[in-house]
A protein has these predicted regions:
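Short, Lys/Arg-enriched N-terminal segments with co-localized hydrophobic residues
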Residues: 1-5
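A short helix->loop->beta-strand "cap" motif at the edges of active sites that frequently abuts
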Residues: 7, 111-116, 137, 298, ...
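N-terminal [4Fe-4S]-dependent radical SAM core
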Residues: 9, 15-24, 166, 172-222
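Flexible glycine/acidic-rich beta-alpha junction loops that bind and position SAM and/or redox cofactors
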Residues: 18, 56-58, 128, 231, ...
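Short catalytic helix/loop segments, enriched in acidic residues and glycine
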Residues: 27-41
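Glycine-rich beta-alpha loop elements in corrinoid/cobalamin-binding modules
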Residues: 39-189
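Catalytic cores of alpha/beta
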Residues: 128-133, 315, 375-390
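Radical SAM [4Fe-4S] cluster-binding motif and immediate context
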Residues: 191, 196-366, 371-373
Length: 403
């Protein structure tokens, strides 16, 4: 892009709304946005990264609906944006963050009326029409964001940014109608994706507190061993965000990244942010064996809701030997009727067997159960209560109830 004036870019992870009655609050580094920052910087752009949570982890502000806003206030966040910034991207995360993100975008638009405003994440992807109609965004990025963000930035830099020609975005046309372009194809070789640009954000603030997605086991870095999930649970945003293609990384290249974090950030533990890290038994066995071959020493966790099918006694022994200490299972319900309606594709009995095998081999197992699915009967709720007791007897040390 020699000859073009490269625009300055700012990526923002907004503050987070937390109910006032929450007894525990632990925040995680923004992995998705860090990947986008890495891709943009690798393409030659000058990227500023504002992590409104990480820059002020111990600060909270009163918010609506008996909640607190943790991190920088919207005005503090906007004040940190460089005055000559031309492209500003906001990570929207999930729908509970929508009001906060929308208000932040409005504040940015007031201060930077001519900037190109981008938004991406689960909420934008799931409800693009609402996002574009109710916010000041110019472009919403759908699904995997690295390639789309780079294409937008390059088009802007060249002066030839044509919204209609960019796959994987949504925007308003000249009549105020929402346009949703054809989705961008998933990247098949995810080992080509540039590592997250953690050096652009205050990662040390998380590390020194042991903050992460899983149990506090010291200085924890987030990593992703795969993208996507082959399952189609009806309540999950995965099919819209990532599609149902599960793509794993090369274990050696993943371990290269983890070794880099050990050397440069003093990482002691790794939290895997995968939607479904263990799909193929052969992959996880290979990964565990590679850790042993390299004689790497660390703990690692699978905190996001692991499938149980591939975890038997053999795999559980390898997991523990390689340093894995905590896993989360997400059976969601103990009722066959509910499981069928939500397309969970698991059997409660297999979950119990997997918990038993894992705990016998030293693993700490947490389980997630959801009450309140549409059409759920009292009988089905009772079945889930019985299932909770069975999981506890099988060895689960923590069971989270969601409603």
């Amino acid at each position: 892009y020699c000859g073009f004036l490269m625009p300055k870019i700012c990526l923002i992870r907004p503050s987070i709304v937390v109910p006032a009655k929450n007894t525990t609050t632990m925040f995680t580094p923004p992995l998705g946005l860090a990947y986008v920052a890495g891709a943009l910087r690798n393409s030659g752009f000058d990227v500023q990264f504002i992590d409104a949570v990480g820059e002020s982890l111990d600060t909270r502000h009163p918010s609506d609906f008996d909640c607190y806003l943790y991190g920088l206030s919207p005005s503090q966040t906007v004040d940190r944006i460089r005055s000559d910034t031309e492209i500003i991207g906001v990570g929207f995360g999930f729908s509970f963050e929508w009001p906060t993100c929308r208000d932040l975008v409005e504040a940015i638009r007031d201060r930077f009326p001519s900037a190109l405003l981008l938004g991406g994440g689960e909420h934008v992807t799931a409800v693009p029409e609402q996002t574009m109609k109710e916010s000041a965004l110019d472009i919403g990025i759908l699904g995997e964001g690295e390639e789309t963000a780079v294409e937008i930035a390059k088009g802007y830099a060249s002066g030839r940014l044509e919204y209609k020609n960019i796959p994987g975005i949504t925007y308003l046309d000249t009549h105020g109608e929402v346009i949703i372009n054809e989705r961008r194809a998933r990247k098949r070789d995810i080992d080509e994706i540039i590592w997250p640009a953690w050096d652009l954000m205050p990662i040390e603030n998380y590390l020194e507190r042991g903050y992460g997605f899983g149990v506090n086991r010291g200085r924890s870095m987030p990593v992703m061993a795969s993208r996507g999930c082959p399952y189609q649970c009806t309540f999950c945003s995965n099919p819209a965000m990532w599609t149902t293609r599960w793509i794993p990384r090369d274990p050696d290249l993943l371990l290269d990244e983890m070794q880099f974090y050990q050397k440069n950030y003093g990482a002691e533990n790794f939290d895997f942010y995968d939607l479904t890290a263990i799909v193929k038994k052969s992959w996880i066995i290979n990964f565990c064996n590679k850790i042993e071959e390299r004689e790497m020493k660390f703990t690692w966790q699978l905190p996001s809701g692991t499938r149980t099918e591939a975890i038997d006694g053999e795999v559980a022994r390898l997991l523990f030997k390689s340093g894995c200490r905590n896993m989360s299972y997400s059976p969601e319900s103990g009722s066959h009727g509910v499981l069928k309606r939500i397309k969970k594709k698991i059997h409660p009995g297999s979950v119990i067997n997997s918990i038993h095998s894992a705990t016998l081999n030293g693993m700490n197992i947490k389980c997630n159960i959801i009450f309140g699915f549409p059409g759920e009967t009292l009988k089905e709720i009772f079945e889930s209560y019985l299932f909770i007791i069975k999981m506890a007897l099988a060895g689960a040390f923590d069971i989270s109830i969601w409603a």
